[in-house]
């Protein structure tokens, strides 16, 4: 590569370089000792010096210097790892610069001109290799060269970043370099003559955590299946850990959770991922999680600022976030003040005059006649320019539609204010108000546009006056809050509103506030008519999803009158079916029916649909799919929170997995299925405001309230009874309606009544005792535990596959486990470096366990070469192709692990007849095709002669009569012919020749090679004769007379085949015709030679093959990717 020119003085330098060639202005040199075979003392000394100093000359032993005539100062301008690479740079210099330099008279001009050209080449090279995105591109390019030389990965394996650190080996630290690439974590150390290489694929990592040990307070520990590795002494450990966490998360989800995981657009192409992309992804994920925004939102700018908060009459310090469709603000003090401004609600963005009291201010005006003042913005010009551009795009793509909701009083104020045609301050943006909601309903009528609680008044709903008065007080408090803090989605969100939510949202405002807190109101306003179209497209269709929906409709709140008739059930059916049509990746999952039925009680049908979208796609990501990965991740996070927040309970209950399992339904249904409905909706209020944090802290509060009984419980069943009874007796004293029990009410035989817990008290305790968890902490825990959950699914898949395969093969379970790891790694390596192949065709978590990982023909060939005992030299790859075609029953060009192990089991543990049968099948269709690349070459071997006798003499004077032996063996085999599942077709002469070539290849380098060759020559001669006899017997009738004489002279017990075989055959016929030979003939012939029998029946050890395969699997793949093999790469046994 080209180097940034730096002057060096060579007059008194040690002779560390040897000049290879030179010109007037350039010198090409080689590092002394490189390519000399290590025999010379000076070369060995230079090599040792480079190793100790970690010199770049170890990986780039060639260089080109710029020399100006008459000067002792030289400038390195290029280096190379190979002679070919450095020669390409030399040729470029001769062709493009050498003739031009002769024009210059001034030496300084020559140096300046060459240096300028080289710097331009470096800029072009870094642009193409993404190094310009690094903070120090020169150092990154040097590290990239070392990474490629040391680990010899294919070109597709891109380096993301690198760090200097120590890797602990027991109590001994090894100083070296940590390289983080898109698929691997690599470590290299060379100290005192000892070289250490570690290669850990990200998909093998089971834990990634920060720990402390006796020697150091902070280390990064990486846990794989077999080992733990500790890395320490980083300059910035926080940065390193975040990058590692992001790389592990992205790679694991891309390769193991591709069912529902969608990468950010910048990360779609793994080979283009950079350190900055990963840092941006981490910031994006925090931003979307904190404000609970759509996944497609991309953060563009973050800046420190202060926001004028009229309720406190001062400016509040915080940060402003600008994304595709939102302007958001978060105060520096957690929970003090947050604001979410959808750009579709923004009318104008203006810069105000800069003053000492209001430095760098901007004003953001929204349609509800509110304005937000931001000050102290450092890069105000660029921020406002970007905001105006995105505002114009949002208004152009989504013209704003206004809805006027008639309000009877101040308590039912509209979410959006009515407006007429409005022109904003850009002049060229017109916001056209659509027809009102009543007009749209006439155009596309919805059966029941009101919440179901308004349509179905429950019997006995006449509540006591005290409950009604408390409801009125709540409504009054909320209206006062709206006046001071705003009533739209753009309201100021402070600790005061959190307290109001914890007290319980009034039923008349519940649906509307759910829409505001989740920002589903923006989706609703941005997609007029979308839900109606979905309903029209989805209703009447019949599929597996609709059948599941129909089955669960009558299980959704059956005790509520709204779902005891067709009206409520029909609305539920429409919402669930429409969502399944919108998002086929999720479709329909159990528990969605319970959640949707509650949404329909308090929101209109279309509003309930968009609330469901917000919950499934933003607030509970990855929850609703057939593996419920998201819920399991939060379940695992909850288990860790129990250890942190309730240490006494964790100490008494050593196994917290039971409590975590019980809590799974809490997360999936938001307590709706295990708590009385009037109490559970209070939980949903907190969930829509605070997100999953509310469920975590409420779950901890429930466990703390029952900690004493849980500690004294004897088993999991008793713990479940304790929690079920407690949750069933949670009441909502402020609910205006009658109590509705949970789906799983607990019936107690106790004589004493169980104490009742008020939901408001429980929620207040949860906020006071466990409300200190921030969104950033929860997202970090989710990322940490997602690795464990995904690896847990991989372990489950592996165990299930092995459980199916073990009974059907004779390979030992521990060997089968290692074989599975090799099989999976073959699939993974293809995903790493062959992005053009559709990964989804090979890895599908929804398929049966045994079929989740499948490999194609090329991957199979690599594995076959590594683990098969039938090594045939250059013929091995051809044999692997034929075996793959044989195993690919459904012809989808993929095979699963079970088929792979079945053929290996025959090779290693099968009897001789099973092995010969497999070889036979490999040389007839479908395994052998007409276009087989080795089937057209004729077999030319002097051993294949048909003139050999059928009776051979032995050294002691005895003879071997093959005719009698073959006759008896064929009779014995014929008896078992009926037992065979399917009679195999006979083999043609062309196929038989290929069969013989395979046998000759298999015997190569065997200790008994000569005996085997002699034996197979004899057997081949015999089989060729048998085939020719059969050919003549099936030819024209003129041969019949010639065949009668030998039959008459032959003994009575001999049949015509052997009698005819005794005659001297002619040479090969010009055409093969009907020349055939059967499996029985081949097997019987082979059995006559003891050396062949010994070869096929000798015990074979698969363990040594597996050990060798683990060490060389990467090297073979790299070689196949046509990368120059400079040093053998071995995957460490982790």
UniProtKB/Swiss-Prot annotation:
Domain of life (superkingdom): Eukaryota
Site label Arginine finger, positions = 551
- Organism, by scientific name, is Mus musculus
Family matches, as Gene3D superfamilies: EF-hand (1.10.238.10), Pleckstrin-homology domain (PH domain)/Phosphotyrosine-binding domain (PTB) (2.30.29.30), putative rabgap domain of human tbc1 domain family member 14 like domains (1.10.8.270), Ypt/Rab-GAP domain of gyp1p, domain 1 (1.10.10.750), Ypt/Rab-GAP domain of gyp1p, domain 3 (1.10.472.80)
Name of the gene encoding the protein in the UniProt record? Tbc1d8
Report disulfide bridges, numbered on this chain. none
Q: What is this protein called?
A: TBC1 domain family member 8
Q: Which InterPro entries match?
A: EF-hand-dom_pair, GRAM, PH-like_dom_sf, Rab-GAP-TBC_dom, Rab-GAP_TBC_sf, TBC1D8_PH-GRAM1, TBC1D8_PH-GRAM2
Q: Which GO terms describe its molecular function?
A: GTPase activator activity
Q: Where is the composition biased (Basic and acidic residues)?
A: 437-447
* Keyword ATP-binding found: no
Q: For the Rab-GAP TBC domain, which residue ranges apply?
A: 504-691
Against SUPFAM superfamilies, the record matches this protein to: EF-hand, Ypt/Rab-GAP domain of gyp1p
Does this UniProt record's set of keywords contain Secreted? Answer: no
Q: Pfam families this protein is in?
A: GRAM, RabGAP-TBC
């Amino acid at each position: 590569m080209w180097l940034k020119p730096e002057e060096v003085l060579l007059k008194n330098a040690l002779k560390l370089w040897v000049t290879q060639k030179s010109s007037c202005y350039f010198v090409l040199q080689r590092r002394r000792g490189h390519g000399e075979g290590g025999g010379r003392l000076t070369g060995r000394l230079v090599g040792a010096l480079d190793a100790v100093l970690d010199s770049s000359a170890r990986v780039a032993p060639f260089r080109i210097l710029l020399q100006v005539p008459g000067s002792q100062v030289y400038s390195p301008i290029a280096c190379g790892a190979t002679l070919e690479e450095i020669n390409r740079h030399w040729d470029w210099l001769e062709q493009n610069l050498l003739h031009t330099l002769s024009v210059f008279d001034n030496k300084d001009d020559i140096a300046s001109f060459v240096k300028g050209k080289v710097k331009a080449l470096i800029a072009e090279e870094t642009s193409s290799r993404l190094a310009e995105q690094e903070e120090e591109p020169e150092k990154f390019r040097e590290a990239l060269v070392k990474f490629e030389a040391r680990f010899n990965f294919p070109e597709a394996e891109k380096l993301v970043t690198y760090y200097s650190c120590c890797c602990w080996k027991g109590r001994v630290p090894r100083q070296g370099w940590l390289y983080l690439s898109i698929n691997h974590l690599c470590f290299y150390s060379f100290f005192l003559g000892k070289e250490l290489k570690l290669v850990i694929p990200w998909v093998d990592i089971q834990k990634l955590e920060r720990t402390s040990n006796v020697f150091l307070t902070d280390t990064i520990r990486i846990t794989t299946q077999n080992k733990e590795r500790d890395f320490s002494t980083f300059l910035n450990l926080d940065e390193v850990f975040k990058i590692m966490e992001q790389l592990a998360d992205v790679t694991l989800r891309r390769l193991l959770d591709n069912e529902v995981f969608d990468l950010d657009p910048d990360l779609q192409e793994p080979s283009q991922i950079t350190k900055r992309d990963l840092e941006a992804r981490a910031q994006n994920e925090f931003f979307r999680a904190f404000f609970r925004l759509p996944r497609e939102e991309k953060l563009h700018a973050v800046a420190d600022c202060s926001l004028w908060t009229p309720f406190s009459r001062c400016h509040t310090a915080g940060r402003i976030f600008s994304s595709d469709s939102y302007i958001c603000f978060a105060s520096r003090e957690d929970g003090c003040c947050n604001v979410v401004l959808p750009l579709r609600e923004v009318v104008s963005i203006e810069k105000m005059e800069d003053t000492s009291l209001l430095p760098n201010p901007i004003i953001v005006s929204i349609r509800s006649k509110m304005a937000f003042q931001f000050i102290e913005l450092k890069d105000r010009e660029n921020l406002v320019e970007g905001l105006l551009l995105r505002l114009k795009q949002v208004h152009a793509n989504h013209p704003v539609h206004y809805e006027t909701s008639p309000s009877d009083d101040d308590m039912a104020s509209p979410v959006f204010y009515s407006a007429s045609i409005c022109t904003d301050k850009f002049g060229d943006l017109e916001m056209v108000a659509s027809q009102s909601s009543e007009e749209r309903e006439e155009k596309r009528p919805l059966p029941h546009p009101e919440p179901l609680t308004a349509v179905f008044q429950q019997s006995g709903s006449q509540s006591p006056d005290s409950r009604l008065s408390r409801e009125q007080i709540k409504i009054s408090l909320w209206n006062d809050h709206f006046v001071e803090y705003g009533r739209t989605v753009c309201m100021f969100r402070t600790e005061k509103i959190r307290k109001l939510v914890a007290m319980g949202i009034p039923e008349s405002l519940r649906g509307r506030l759910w829409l505001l807190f989740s920002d589903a109101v923006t989706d609703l306003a941005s997609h007029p008519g979308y839900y109606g179209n979905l309903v029209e497209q989805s209703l009447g269709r019949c599929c597996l999803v609709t059948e599941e929906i129909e089955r669960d409709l009558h299980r959704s709140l059956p005790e509520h009158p709204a779902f005891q008739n067709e009206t409520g059930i029909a609305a539920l059916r429409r919402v669930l079916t429409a969502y399944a049509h919108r998002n086929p990746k999720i479709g329909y999952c159990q528990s969605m029916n319970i959640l949707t039925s509650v949404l329909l009680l308090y929101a209109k049908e279309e509003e309930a649909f968009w609330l469901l979208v917000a919950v499934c796609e933003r607030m509970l990501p990855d929850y609703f799919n057939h593996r419920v990965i998201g819920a399991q991740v939060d379940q695992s996070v909850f288990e860790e929170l129990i250890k942190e927040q309730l240490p006494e309970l964790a100490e008494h209950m050593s196994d917290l997995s039971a409590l975590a399992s019980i809590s799974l339904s809490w997360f999936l249904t938001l307590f709706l299925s295990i708590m009385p409905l009037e109490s559970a909706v209070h939980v949903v209020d907190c969930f829509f405001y605070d997100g999953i944090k509310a469920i975590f802290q409420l779950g901890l509060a429930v466990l703390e309230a029952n900690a004493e009984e849980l500690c004294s419980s004897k088993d999991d069943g008793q713990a479940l009874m304790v929690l079920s009874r407690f949750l069933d007796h949670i009441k909502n004293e402020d609910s205006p309606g009658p109590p509705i029990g949970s789906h799983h009410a607990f019936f107690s035989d106790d004589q004493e009544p169980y104490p009742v817990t008020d939901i408001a008290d429980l929620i207040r305790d949860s906020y006071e005792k466990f409300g200190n968890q921030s969104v950033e902490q929860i997202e970090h825990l989710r990322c940490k535990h997602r690795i464990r959950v995904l690896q847990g699914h991989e372990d489950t898949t592996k165990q299930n596959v092995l459980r199916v395969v073990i009974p059907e093969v004779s390979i030992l379970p521990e060997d089968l486990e290692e074989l599975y790891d090799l099989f999976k790694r073959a699939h993974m390596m293809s995903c790493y470096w062959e992005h053009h192949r559709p990964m989804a065709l090979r890895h599908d978590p929804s398929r049966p366990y045994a079929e989740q990982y499948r490999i194609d023909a090329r991957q199979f060939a690599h594995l076959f070469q590594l683990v098969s005992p039938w090594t045939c030299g250059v013929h091995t790859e051809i044999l692997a192709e034929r075996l793959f075609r044989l195993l690919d029953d459904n012809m989808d060009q993929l095979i699963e692990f079970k088929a792979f192990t079945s053929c290996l089991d025959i090779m290693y543990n099968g009897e001789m007849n099973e092995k010969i049968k497999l070889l036979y099948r490999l040389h007839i269709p479908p395994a052998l095709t007409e276009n087989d690349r080795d089937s057209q070459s004729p077999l030319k071997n002097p051993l294949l002669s048909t003139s050999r006798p059928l009776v051979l003499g032995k050294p002691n004077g005895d003879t071997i009569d093959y005719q009698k032996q073959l006759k008896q063996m064929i009779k014995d085999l014929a008896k078992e012919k009926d037992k065979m599942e399917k009679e195999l077709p006979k083999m043609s002469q062309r196929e038989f020749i290929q069969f013989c070539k395979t046998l000759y290849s298999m015997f190569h380098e065997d200790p008994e090679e000569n005996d085997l060759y002699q034996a197979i020559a004899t057997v081949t001669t015999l089989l060729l004769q048998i085939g020719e006899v059969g050919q003549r017997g099936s030819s024209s009738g003129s041969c019949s007379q010639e065949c009668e004489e030998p039959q008459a002279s032959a003994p009575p017990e001999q049949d015509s085949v052997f009698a005819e075989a005794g005659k001297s055959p002619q040479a090969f016929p010009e055409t093969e015709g009907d020349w055939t030979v059967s499996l029985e003939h081949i097997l019987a012939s082979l059995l006559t030679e003891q050396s062949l029998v010994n070869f096929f029946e000798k015990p074979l050890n698969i363990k040594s093959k597996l050990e060798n395969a683990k060490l060389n699997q990467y090297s073979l793949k790299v070689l196949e990717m046509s990368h120059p093999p400079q040093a053998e790469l071995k995957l460490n046994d982790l």
